């Protein structure tokens, strides 16, 4: 095997913003609610329904960007990422890519970032995980599968995306 290549590993980490309403409509976010009880024409993608930005999500994202040393964009834009999945009622996802809200920045790693029961201690002085961007997007609905059937819970459609465990990130290092 040639030694001319250097492995480059990138991570895409999703964080769920704790907001009272969905990303682009006023439907409440209540996890564990009865399926399909928190939906509206906007999050179901019905004709004529227009999205309205969740101001709370915008503020939380800007605050996060400032805490992580990102450049906060003067102008950002949202795109419709088109694809078809049964749990995407609009056949597109509202997301950001080339003009995100936050650019650059980084997450400083410290010894305290590792759980006390970690198997080995890793010196992390001056180590920073560099960020490319922080952007906002909505989540898709939740598919569930039973023994003889499947269903879709649209309560989650249009919410900020679900979080992934911070521990899973620490395990990579």
Predicted regions: what is each one?
Residues 1-173:
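Basic, nucleic-acid-interacting segments
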């Amino acid at each position: 095997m040639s030694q001319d290549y250097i492995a480059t590993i990138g991570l895409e980490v999703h964080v769920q913003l704790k907001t009272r309403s969905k990303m682009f409509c006023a439907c409440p976010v209540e996890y564990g609610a009865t399926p399909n009880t928190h939906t509206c024409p906007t999050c179901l993608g019905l004709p004529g329904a227009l999205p309205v930005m969740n101001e709370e999500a915008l503020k939380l994202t800007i605050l996060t960007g400032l805490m992580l040393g990102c450049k906060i964009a003067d102008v950002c834009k949202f795109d419709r990422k088109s694809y078809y999945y049964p749990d995407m009622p609009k056949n597109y996802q509202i997301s950001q890519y080339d003009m995100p809200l936050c650019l650059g920045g980084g997450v400083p790693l410290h010894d305290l970032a590792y759980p006390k029961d970690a198997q080995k201690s890793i010196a992390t002085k001056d180590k920073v995980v560099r960020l490319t961007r922080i952007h906002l997007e909505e989540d898709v609905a939740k598919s569930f599968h039973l023994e003889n059937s499947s269903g879709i819970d649209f309560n989650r459609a249009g919410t900020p995306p679900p979080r992934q465990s911070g521990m899973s990130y620490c395990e990579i290092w």
